Amino acid sequence: MTESGNGIVNTRQPKLFLDVPDMTSEAKKTYAELDVCTYTPKNLGDSKHEFMECDCFEEFRDGLNHACGEDSDCINRATLIECVNGLCKHSCGTDCQNQRFQKKAYADISVFKTERKGFGVRANSDIEPHNFIYEYIGEVIQEEEFRNRMVKYDQMGFKHFYFMMLQTGQFIDATLKGCIARFCNHSCNPNAYVNKWVVNGKLKMGIFANRHISKGEEVTFDYNVDRYGANAQPCYCEEPNCIGFLGGKTQTDAASLLPQSFADALGIRPSMEKKWINMMKAKGEKIAKSDTTTVNVDFVNSLSLEPCTKTEDVNRVMSVLLQIDDAFIAEKLLERITLTEDEAMHYQFIKLHGYLIFSRLITMFEDKPDIIWKILNFLLVLPKTTKNGIIHSGIDKKVEQLKNTPKFEVICEDLLEKWSKYETYTRISKKDISENSKVIDLRRIRLPIGWEIIHENGRPVYYNAQRQIKQANPPTDSAYRSNSSHNLSGVSDPKSRSATPSSNTSRYSGSVKYIPTPTYGQMQQKRTLSPEEYEKRKKSRIEWEQKELELRKLMEQETLKAKLDQETQKKSELERIIEEANKQKELERLQKLKQQQEDEERKKVKKQASHVNAIENKWVKFFAQHVPNLIKNYQKDVGKDVLKESARNIVKSLAQKELKKDSSRSPPEELSKEKRAKVKTFSMQYMDRLVAKMKEKKEKKR
């Protein structure tokens, strides 16, 4: 019985290859051996961020530095970064335990010849869960060269390709140059997984044990995540959950939907992937595998993310964010962070270079104000610590810049004011440890949540910034201890998401029953026939089962297609009805809008006319006070009635002249002398013309 990394117990005994000859020497003749990866150009594989020291201390015993070990709470180890001699001089010193890639601390493995898969890799001794097995070494190339080599190797007739995606646009090619890790075969139920570490400024890819691996057992991992080949190939892993094919552009049913480290960081369980894949199958939709990314965006978008509840959850999230350049995954991980309300987890976020990560996220999402707002809000709720991490990350300067944006001004001011009250301290050094080791070994103290060891007045002091407590002796508050309800010393241990072995029941309902592949022990018990006859019957049975499976799949596909066509037709009809209704609704809206605009225009014209008429009436009244007196002497010439009519005409003409000059101006309270003279002249000219016309008319009658 073996237990996988995700805690699932596999009752199927692993197959051992103890008596198969060692073929390592022969296998190495098929490629050029490399001790380290080569990079063309040299900047490929570079980490995008500067190296960060851990906060461990040297721990020499028996001539060996035990710092940063498997059971330590080393920040670098938890975030998949190796410590480097010369760069950790103020912390863990030289040759600590977190240098497995650099020291080539490989597991004892060898190459052997498999029955159907060519060469394979087996364990020469037991390997414990999450132990480092081997670095995947090869030529690191750009995407354009990767595509050229894919075509080239296919034309050369190569059956096996050895491409692994290191990061976006960069690939490790171990086809012609590499190491024996290239011979690790695929399995649908693997005992190892691939993870990426930052080692001395370069991103490295390593193979790690997913569960206990017994001596003689083949070492396998899932190709369907980071490994690339030209065409899909038959799978010969013989696992109960085998899907039949691996590689190619289209993912198979059990293909991983995103890299192991991303899945662990997002809190994705195997059942979640399986449920989504089954749902896609039911819809008759293929799960496409992109050439440019290892993340299935549709699957990730379908997830309902959960907050971090354990230290290892935080470790996984922060280790990915330290390396990631994928904004899509970064946004999803940020969502998981902001959902977390547990203060113990908040302290762990801060501890694992939290302020540095949030500083990078602000830069990554500088053109997305909604995400920036989320980051600032989360920073505001983080508990108080020392100011060292804030200053080192430079996040205070970025918040200062964001303050110039009106939307962020208030929250940035609140955040900067909060940080201004934090204190900066010199952390305890190795010299301080040496001087105080006679009294107490500071390296072995497991501090409660929120506590730090700082240097004050030449002596180590225990400090809790949130509670504003300093004391000379180690804190003993059990309610805040890291090893009580929350294990803050946990190290990120990626878990396997491979499907578990199926039970001996039919995989499908109906008349056709699928018989699972027998276990290795069952096959041993049935070998009463000769090997030749046994193999013949086995081949025949497999062929029959394959045909039955293909027939069943074909029937399922036809049923699903018919159902999908019917649903598509219903959907199209519904969309047509909705479209017609929307068109009618839009037409009514436009007509109503047009009517409103016409009504508004009429009101506007009427209002303007009303305003002009009011002003005109004021001018008429104004001139009516003066014109009759100016022309009263003409009554003897034209008569009383004609004089009144003439006065009205003169007043109206004068009012029209004023409106033409300015239709909004009202008349003055009094008529000025200059204006009176002009009005008098106009009025008398009008009357003189009228008198002349009347005299001319009388003379014609005579």
Curated annotation (Swiss-Prot):
GO terms, molecular function: histone H3K36 trimethyltransferase activity
Key word Transit peptide present: no
Signal peptide: none
Biased composition (Basic and acidic residues): 529-541, 656-674
Domain AWS: 49-105
Region (Disordered): 472-541, 656-678
WW domain location: 445-477
SET domain sequence ranges: 107-224
An annotated GO BP: regulation of DNA-templated transcription
Residues in coiled coil: 554-611
Reactions mediated catalytically: L-lysyl(36)-[histone H3] + 3 S-adenosyl-L-methionine = N(6),N(6),N(6)-trimethyl-L-lysyl(36)-[histone H3] + 3 S-adenosyl-L-homocysteine + 3 H(+)
Enzymatic class: transferase
Keywords assigned: Chromosome, Coiled coil, Methyltransferase, Nucleus, Repressor, S-adenosyl-L-methionine, Transcription, Transcription regulation, Transferase
InterPro entries per record: AWS_dom (IPR006560), Post-SET_dom (IPR003616), Set2_fungi (IPR025788), SET2_Histone-Lys_MeTrsfase (IPR050777), SET_dom (IPR001214), SET_dom_sf (IPR046341), SETD2/Set2_SET (IPR044437), SRI (IPR013257)
Gene3D superfamilies: SET domain (2.170.270.10), Set2, Rpb1 interacting domain (1.10.1740.100)
Bias (Polar residues): 472-490, 497-509, 519-528
Catalytic activity, EC: 2.1.1.359
Residues annotated as domain Post-SET: 231-247
SMART domains per the UniProt record, alphabetical: AWS, PostSET, SET
GO CC, alphabetical: chromosome; nucleus
Subcellular location: Nucleus; Chromosome
Family classification: Belongs to the class V-like SAM-binding methyltransferase superfamily. Histone-lysine methyltransferase family. SET2 subfamily.
Role description: Histone methyltransferase that trimethylates histone H3 'Lys-36' forming H3K36me3. Involved in transcription elongation as well as in transcription repression.
Domain notes from UniProt: The AWS and SET domains are necessary for transcription repression.
Name assigned to this protein: Histone-lysine N-methyltransferase, H3 lysine-36 specific
Organism of origin: Kluyveromyces lactis (strain ATCC 8585 / CBS 2359 / DSM 70799 / NBRC 1267 / NRRL Y-1140 / WM37)
Gene: SET2
